[in-house]
Amino acid sequence: MSQQPGSDRRVNFAQEEPMTLGEKISHRMDQFKEMVSSGCCSCASRCPSVAIVLILALVILGILAAIPLTLMLTSSAQRMSTDSTDLSPYSIRHPKFWPKTDKIHFNDLDGIPMSSLFPPNVSTCSGFGFACTGAVHMIIPSSKRCDGIKDCQDGSDEENCKECQSVFSCRSHVEEDSKTKRKTKVLPTLICLTAEKLCNDVQDCPDGSDESVCKSTCSKDQFKCTGNNACLPTSAKCDGVNDCTDGSDEKNCNECQKGAHKCGKQCIKASHVCDGVAQCADRSDEKECDCKSCSGSDKALCEDGTCIKRTQVCDGKKDCTDGMDEENCPGSCSIEAFSTKTKQLTCSDEKRYTESEACSGVVEACEQSCPKCHPKLTFTCPAVGGSQKRCIRRSKVCDGINDCDDGADEKNCTPIKECGIENASQFTCDRKCLDASRRCDGVWDCEDKSDEQNCQQCSSGSIRCAADKKCLPAYTRCNGVAECSDGSDEQKCSCEECLGAHSNTYMCNESNRCLKRDEVCSPYSMCPNATYTDKAYCAALVLKNSGRFPY
């Protein structure tokens, strides 16, 4: 039988052996390799098929692993956001009337108990007021929220307002209805405006309503300002805010409105009541306050309801009843340690000093506050005309400068040329001629203090530095300044020697050392063997300098 032409080119599939599983996998990998090399990367043709497949598998596994990790991070961020409401750097409360003291949570200062930095009867009313969006550590009182005045640097206190405390408000924007194409007033928030923004030829409201309140005739529930013809609601009268340019809306007020406080016939606006600054002569606008009214990062509330500035806490001046704002402050010691007989004076700087310090001539603010000048340390300038007598330090006598109004401190002075002629024991210093009795008496008559050096002994009531052979005035003992080279005048100080005799001093917690309060931190505590409280006080000053803390 003869073959048909072309029959030799037919393939007999029945005779072909099937591929194994491994051959199929290898075949698929070769196909994938060919696709990659021809589609995106020609260099893949030189790589083994197995390597390419393994790389692809690792990429897929990485993507799958990233999905649960992303979900975990998102959940953690939400949880942290919820917990962040506890960021309260000023949570100082009286242990009897407020919750337990919280801790601050700022940077490496975490864990410092604020109770060690504030008196126990003074609160900062944590949780009250409005936290500025751009600076959460800056808190403003609720009375300044949505009042038409930007108190936060970012103006966030005037954003998203649902209700205004200002005299005028308008809708924040006007949206168009997409179906009717008509403008409909959609009011998610309000714009709060003070009276000075009305009728000033500047459109602040989207609908221009702030420029349309000036009318010839006002409605029954309005009154007209004579200065700019603005029609304002009657509730704007006697609210402590001059809404009319001539102030006529705040004259002859028998009663005050909108939370304003009455002083005589004057109304103090609500935002100035319980703000730590007395507007009334009797300070009644700062009494009977609570945390809602006395809130803010610069305020402090005394247990008796007095609102004070936070800078007034532990400043050496009693602002709360019975001086509770000065009790148990860092660097203080027990009040029982002071002698009840120690007299104190309030000088022209409104700070209190012991009479011995105030009348020794070293505090200029007290020169006219003393009933009697120290007979040894000072010179008494007589009262002349309407002036009061003054106590000046003795080194100012015969220095060529008239410190007394009548020049009494420069009278009866021996000229330098005649010094030692009639009295051989006289000596000179700083263009002065002094008697020998003025040497080594524990009083600095010379500005360079040379009259108290090279002393074998000192007068009674003074201090002798054995290492330096010099005499010091008694008031220099434990004043925070080491006059002796060995520091012996500042060692083993008692509470009364430190705080009982000096102002503006800091008593180290356990080392019986006194330091000047403005020098105790540099920036860390300079106290020997500084305690937790000493360190916390200096940490507080770090926060203060960054605008984030109490004092």
From Swiss-Prot:
Disulphide connectivity of cysteines: 132-152, 146-161, 164-192, 170-205, 199-214, 218-231, 225-244, 238-253, 256-267, 263-280, 274-289, 294-307, 302-320, 314-329, 373-391, 381-404, 398-413, 419-433, 429-446, 440-455, 458-471, 465-484, 478-493
Segments in the Cytoplasmic topological domain: 1-49
UniProt cross-references to Pfam families, sorted A to Z: Ldl_recept_a
Record's subcellular location: Cell membrane
GO CC terms, sorted: apical plasma membrane; receptor complex
Topological domains annotated Extracellular: 71-551
Disruption phenotype: RNAi-mediated knockdown results in sterility due to the loss of oocyte fertilization.
One BP term from GO: receptor-mediated endocytosis
Glycosylation site residues: 121, 423, 509, 529
MF annotations from Gene Ontology: hormone binding
TM stretches of this protein: 50-70
UniProt keyword list: Cell membrane, Developmental protein, Disulfide bond, Fertilization, Glycoprotein, Membrane, Receptor, Repeat, Signal-anchor, Transmembrane, Transmembrane helix
Function according to Swiss-Prot or TrEMBL: Probable receptor which is required for the oocyte-to-zygote transition although its exact function is controversial. Seems to be required for fertilization probably by promoting the interaction or fusion between sperm and oocyte. Conversely, shown to be dispensable for fertilization but required for the formation of a continuous and cohesive eggshell chitin layer by maintaining a homogenous distribution of chitin synthase chs-1 at the unfertilized oocyte cell membrane.
UniProt name for this protein: LDL receptor repeat-containing protein egg-1
